[in-house]
Regions:
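Non-transmembrane, aqueous-exposed alpha-helical and coiled segments at domain scale
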Residues: 2-415
Length: 415
């Protein structure tokens, strides 16, 4: 995948960098994260869960990481799962095993004692709710993310630290959770009820699984900052999936913005000195929601087939991604939301087959053209205003320097 770094910044000197997406995710962050991880001492996942994947291609093969930080392929890196992550403990263990089964050395992993635990019933509730909503569903990956974060903010989630506390206190909390959940299961979803003993036993199993990795990761990271370590904060999805600033309600349930990296990792906000924001040379999305520059039919199938690392299909769901032309309005907004100090464009080579390349430069709504990204109820009625750029129509894979690109490709990046 070809990429270009745009703009200037303090990339080499930065102590803490955040790498995030400007759009709906799938921007190619994994490739850039892998590149930056090699220069880092610590890589931190700070939000989300196993609901989205980062594709990494290296000497060990091709991997789609869903929960583990991208630093797991480097022996010198400590990989941290921060307090902001939706921690699916069996999935963590499974993903670690999938690495070692393919001859990747066992990575150094730390898990925050303040992280909250994804429970099996979160995944069940996600599935039940999508079924209940039917044609009006949000296109969930059914990874339990929305029910998990609902419980976290309703203060009925289970923190990792609680596994190592008083068991009677834990059992009292389980009883309260079951009382609340079983009302919904019985009267709304008409599904089997939760059993207190089963939940306690599950949590005790999780305790043994995660015990080797648990620590106060915030204290660890604060000490690392004092020692001048290089820390990389690895974001999931992108600006347009943020619950506050994205295409609500077709969003995820945790903040996808770089400033949240400090909260989800447990470090001072001022310590983030670089925000590397990734965009793709065209647009893509998984699931429902407004998508102004979307294309359809044979045109979409061709771009989908040529896109990404082996086609535009979700790393978690395998669903074909919706695709469209580069959207200047949405991308500018996404970059601004992230507070980008650098912008990286990926997948430029995927457009090499086109003689002409449309770009969305504005939105038309009620006979007017707007350049600012609107709220959802306006966005869904917008039509793309397209400008056609000349394609380079040659293979640019393998080109290492921006100056060596065909002029048309350079013009596209600079547009």
């Amino acid at each position: 995948m070809l990429y270009a770094i745009l703009g200037t910044s303090r990339m080499e000197e930065a102590m803490v960098k955040a790498i995030v997406g400007a759009n709906c995710g799938d921007e190619g962050k994994g490739k850039i994260t892998d590149m930056l991880a090699e220069e880092s001492d610590i890589v931190v996942r700070f939000q989300g869960g196993s609901n989205a994947g980062h594709t990494i291609i290296n000497d060990y093969g091709k991997f789609a990481l869903h929960l583990l930080p991208s630093g797991v392929f480097y022996n010198h890196i400590t990989s941290v799962i921060g307090n902001g992550v939706a921690l699916n403990i069996p999935y963590l263990v499974k993903e670690l095993k999938s690495l070692t089964d393919r001859n990747v050395p066992m990575p150094k992993i730390l898990v925050s004692d303040r992280a909250q635990i994804m429970m099996p019933y979160h995944i069940d509730f996600d599935t039940y709710e999508e079924a209940r909503l039917a044609g009006k569903s949000f296109g969930s990956t059914k990874s339990g993310i929305a029910p998990f974060y609902s419980d976290k903010y309703a203060k009925i989630g289970f923190q990792v630290s609680e596994l190592f506390g008083d068991e009677n206190t834990l059992k009292e909390k389980i009883a309260n959770v079951c009382t609340l959940k079983n009302v919904m299961l019985e009267h709304l979803y008409h599904q089997p009820l939760l059993n207190e003993e089963d939940i306690f036993n599950t949590l005790m199993e999780y305790k043994e699984m995660v015990k080797p990795y648990v620590c106060d990761t915030s204290a660890y990271l604060h000490q690392a900052l004092k020692e001048g370590k290089k820390i990389l904060l690895e974001g999931q999805l992108g600006s347009l999936k943020d619950p506050d600033h994205g295409i609500y309600p077709m969003v995820t349930s945790s903040s996808t913005l770089a400033p949240y990296g400090a909260i989800g990792a447990g470090i001072p906000a001022a310590s983030i000195t670089d925000v590397v924001t990734v965009v793709k040379a065209y647009s893509s999305a998984v699931g429902a929601g407004a998508f102004v520059s979307e294309i359809f039919g044979d045109e979409a199938d061709e771009l989908r087939r040529r896109g990404g690392d082996g086609g535009e299909f979700g790393a978690t769901t395998g669903r074909p991604r919706r695709v469209g032309w580069f959207d200047c309005v949405a991308t500018r907004y996404g970059v601004e939301c992230q507070g980008a100090t650098q912008v990286v464009m990926t997948a430029l080579d995927c457009l090499s087959y086109l003689e002409e390349i449309p770009v969305c430069v504005g939105y038309e709504i009620d006979g007017k053209v707007i350049k600012d990204f609107p709220v959802t109820h306006i966005l869904k009625d917008c039509k793309p205003v397209l400008k056609t750029l000349k394609g380079w129509h040659c293979d640019i894979r393998g080109i290492q320097n921006f100056e060596d690109l065909p002029q048309e490709a350079k013009d596209y990046v600079a547009f």
